[in-house]
Design a protein with these regions (language model features):
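Surface-exposed, glycine-biased beta-strand/turn segments
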Residues: 16-105, 136, 185-232
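Short amphipathic beta-strand/extended segments with alternating polar/hydrophobic composition
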Residues: 47-49, 54-58, 119-122, 167-179
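Conserved beta-strand positions that form and line the central face of beta-propeller blades
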Residues: 75, 108, 118, 142, ...
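Solvent-exposed loop/turn segments at secondary-structure junctions
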Residues: 81-83, 97-100, 114-116, 124-125, ...
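Zn2+-dependent peptidoglycan hydrolase active-site motif and core
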Residues: 87-126, 130, 153-157
Length: 232
């Protein structure tokens, strides 16, 4: 084999290996919603979105410091005890991992396409064990709340990360098949995003939010921001 052809083949093989280790292409939307019922006041509504939300911007130096100042996932507001479904086929990786937050209970499922899903603020410890196989649409948990009393903040916190390392977070709206624009119209949480007045169009759409690297540099430290009342 000619040396040039040999190098080309080797480069192609290396690229194939690297690409094979990456999560599935973003435009495939391989996952489904983690809830069984249609949205509505008696079932569930969209809560805080993923990314550069106004609330995350306000809490960028505290609650969301580890997420580069952004909200790690998307919240589904629902009464405590609402069934939570696996968004795709996979294997249970962790149950009640303190490392990944979203307490009092959480669950991580590694999916075959290189992604992992984290289900947080669960009502009780999921009745699953690491290594157990689960199917898309299977009930895996119940919604709870971070305050432990289910008085007013019942919701599911859902994250999509890189399987195995869990250091990279992705926008669920780019990976879950759903009409996100319609869902955002009736949610219980405002869908505003913080605005950098020096680049006011950046990160202003549900599906236009950036990936997050855990403990990476802050992405939303703006000299001038909107809304002004949230600045520090």
């Amino acid at each position: 084999l000619h040396p040039v052809a040999s190098h080309t083949l080797m480069a192609a093989l290396l690229m194939a290996i690297l690409l094979g280790a990456q999560p599935a292409a973003r435009d495939e939307r391989p996952f489904t919603l983690p809830v069984a019922y249609p949205p509505g006041p008696s079932t569930w509504l969209l809560g805080q979105l993923y990314g550069n939300t106004v609330f995350a911007y306000y809490q960028r130096n505290s609650l969301y410091d580890a997420g580069q100042g952004l909200h790690f996932g998307v919240d589904f507001t629902a009464r405590c005890g609402t069934p939570v479904l696996a968004i795709g086929d996979g294997v249970v990786a962790k149950v009640d991992s303190a490392t990944h937050g979203a307490l009092p209970h959480n669950l991580i499922i590694d999916h075959d396409n290189g992604y992992a899903s984290l289900y947080g603020h669960l009502l009780q410890r999921p009745e699953l064990t690491p290594g157990e196989r689960v199917a898309r649409g299977q009930m895996v948990a119940l919604t709870g709340d971070p305050d432990l009393d289910c008085s007013w903040r019942g919701h599911l916190h859902l994250e999509i990360r890189d399987a195995g390392r869990y250091k990279r977070l992705y926008n669920p709206a780019q990976l879950i098949e759903a009409d996100w624009d319609s869902l955002a119209l009736a949610g219980s949480y405002n869908s505003w995003f913080a605005r950098d007045l020096e680049d006011p169009r950046r990160w202003q759409h549900i599906r236009g939010q950036p990936d997050i690297t855990v403990w990476g540099p802050r992405l939303n430290e703006y000299p001038q921001a909107w809304p002004l009342a949230w600045q520090r």
